């Protein structure tokens, strides 16, 4: 039926044209933005995941920047420590030279003074962005320095920033800015070699080799030994598990220390039940007397020089250990930085697979829609001409 009030063919053609135009708009939007899922209305689940992961990727970018800053701090500290080690090696060599008979120790001291000033200069200069890891205030104990290492999200959705920690303590900083507990401003005590103790128990003597102890391992005054008391054959016995002999600090080894203790049936200490007698102090410590930072060898004797050389060598050991720790952290930061780069690329790639548009597919679809649009316009034109055909009947 032909009607001049309702043109069903034109309405159908117009509806088709509108649908094609809407599809073209969507396709053009995907082509211009490059996104298949550009908003939550396109795909709520994928859009939500992509938005969250993009946010995490931005956080990882900040982590990457922080790792670069941390690497610079560590590298600066390592370079300073490495330079300081070379200077302390020179000081040690000067001290060894000073042990030679007839040398002018005052002249050697002048050279050592310049080297000490160089150590101070190195420690002061080893700073990056206001952070100095070669000197610190240790009056309140160790100071922890941190470098941002990663940004993580667990299965429950909780996020956290992980850090790489480095402790500034008496064995890792060159100078204590307030006290004297840094590697270069503390006095080292050097343990003597092990000695042999002669133990006399009820008249029977036996020898026992006792290794020297470092200062830190000595038991404080007032400590007690542990053991069991027993009676057998009319004699008193004490089974000793731990005996500590107090070590004296002296320029040379102290002698003549002894421990004497006895037991009776009642457990009272009387006399001569057992005796530990030593010819030399079993755990004596020779004090270097000076730190690396305040060395003065003018007028120093041979024994004191030997102790000082041992003290400087102990400082070198601590510095080498600290440099190794810094090197390990530097290596870890490099590995973490490489990992964060790869992780960021993986996240970006994963998000792309979720929301990116396939440009080949979209361009092909656009060509097809343009053809459909032209045909729909032609169909609408034909449908609109039906009313003109009706008018021709009345001519």
Curated annotation (Swiss-Prot):
GO MF annotation, one: structural molecule activity
Domain of life, source organism: Bacteria
Keyword annotations from UniProtKB, A to Z: Bacterial flagellum, Secreted
Cellular localisation: Secreted; Bacterial flagellum
Predominant subcellular localization, coarse grouping: secreted
Pfam family, one: Flagellin_C
InterPro entries named among the record's database cross-references: Flagellin, Flagellin_C, Flagellin_N
GO annotations of cellular component type: bacterial-type flagellum; extracellular region
Database matches in PANTHER family: FLAGELLIN
Function: Flagellin is the subunit protein which polymerizes to form the filaments of bacterial flagella. Homomer of FlaA is able to form a functional filament.
Family: Belongs to the bacterial flagellin family.
Name assigned to this protein: Flagellin A
Organism: Rhizobium meliloti (Ensifer meliloti)
Organismal lineage: Bacteria, Pseudomonadati, Pseudomonadota, Alphaproteobacteria, Hyphomicrobiales
């Amino acid at each position: 039926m032909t009607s001049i009030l309702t043109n069903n063919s034109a309405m159908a053609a117009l509806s088709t044209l509108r649908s094609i135009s809407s599809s073209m708009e969507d396709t053009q939007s995907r082509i211009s933005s490059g996104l298949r899922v550009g908003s939550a209305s396109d795909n709520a689940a994928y859009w939500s995941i992509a938005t969250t992961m993009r946010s995490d990727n931005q956080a990882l970018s900040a982590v990457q920047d922080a790792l670069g800053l941390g690497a610079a701090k560590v590298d600066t500290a390592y370079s300073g420590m490495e330079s300081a080690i070379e200077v302390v090696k020179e000081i040690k060599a000067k001290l060894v030279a000073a042990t030679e008979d007839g040398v002018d120790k005052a002249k050697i001291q002048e050279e050592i003074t310049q080297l000490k000033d160089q150590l101070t200069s190195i420690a002061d200069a080893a700073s990056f962005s206001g952070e100095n890891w070669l000197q610190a205030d240790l009056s309140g104990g160790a100071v922890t320095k941190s470098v941002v290492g990663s940004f993580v999200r667990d299965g429950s959705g909780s996020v956290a920033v992980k850090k790489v920690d480095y402790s500034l303590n008496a064995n890792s900083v060159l100078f204590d800015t307030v006290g004297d507990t840094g590697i270069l401003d503390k006095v080292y005590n050097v343990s003597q070699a092990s000695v042999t103790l002669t133990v006399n128990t009820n008249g029977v003597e036996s020898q026992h080799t006792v290794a020297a102890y470092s200062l830190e391992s000595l038991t404080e005054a007032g400590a007690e030994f542990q053991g069991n008391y027993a009676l057998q054959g009319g004699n008193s016995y004490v089974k000793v598990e731990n005996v500590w002999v107090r070590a004296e600090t002296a320029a040379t080894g102290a002698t003549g220390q002894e421990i004497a203790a006895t037991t009776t049936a009642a457990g009272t200490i009387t006399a001569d039940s057992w005796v530990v007698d030593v010819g030399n102090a079993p755990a004596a410590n020779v004090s270097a007397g000076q730190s690396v930072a305040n060395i003065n060898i003018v007028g120093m004797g041979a024994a004191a020089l030997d102790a000082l050389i041992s003290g400087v060598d102990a400082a070198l050991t601590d510095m080498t250990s600290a440099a190794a720790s810094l090197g390990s952290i530097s290596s870890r930061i490099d590995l973490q930085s490489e990992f964060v780069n790869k992780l960021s690329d993986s996240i970006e790639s994963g998000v792309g697979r979720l929301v990116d548009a396939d440009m080949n597919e979209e361009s092909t679809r656009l060509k097809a829609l343009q053809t459909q649009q032209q045909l729909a316009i032609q169909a609408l034109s034909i449908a609109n001409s039906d009313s003109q055909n009706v008018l021709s009947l009345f001519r």
